[in-house]
Every structure is written in structure tokens, then in C-alpha cells.
Amino acid sequence: MRRKLLTILFTLLAPFAAHAEWLIAECSAYTPYDCGTITATGETVHVGGVACNFLPFGTVVVIDGVEYIVNDRCGIDGCIDIFMESYEDAIQFGRQYKEVYIKR
């Protein structure tokens, strides 16, 4: 039930996400084995990068106290994909709803 409510809330707030300082986002993980090694910005994938469709490239986001930079795009609207080097770490992370702070 909580997950469904968060999904509805995020769907309603997604158009305004670029103007928010804090939001709750569905987060998942990806590896170079999933999508290749080059990001949408032309960089080589690296730890500290995230894929996100609703924030501009270069935006710094903080998730669980760790800073990440948006440097890629993902196939799921409203989701933030965190790059991880190992498949095992990505599987262990799974899909989670996280508080995300957008640094301006």
C-alpha cells in the first residue's frame, strides 16, 4: 500500500521535480553490463553517476548522504538509476524509494 501511495504521489509531483529541493524517488541500480559503458553525455560510466530523465545533466543529487551527478538517461520515467560497478551490488540494491535532495 505504501509503495502504491508513493508511486501516485511521485507521479503527481514529477512535473514539478525540477523546482523541488527534496523529493521521494524510485531508485534502482544499473551496471556497465546492462547498458554499455558510455553515458548519454558521452562520458564513460563511473561510480557517482546516475541516470535520470527528469533532471538536467550535471545536476547534483544526494541520496543516503552520497552525492551523485546526473550524467545519463534511463528508460523508466520518474526513476533515478544509480550506477554500480558490480551486478551483485545492483541486484542487492534492487528498487527502493529514497529521499532525494537536489542541490542547486
Describe the function of each predicted region:
Residues 1-4:
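Positively charged n-region of N-terminal signal peptides that target proteins for export
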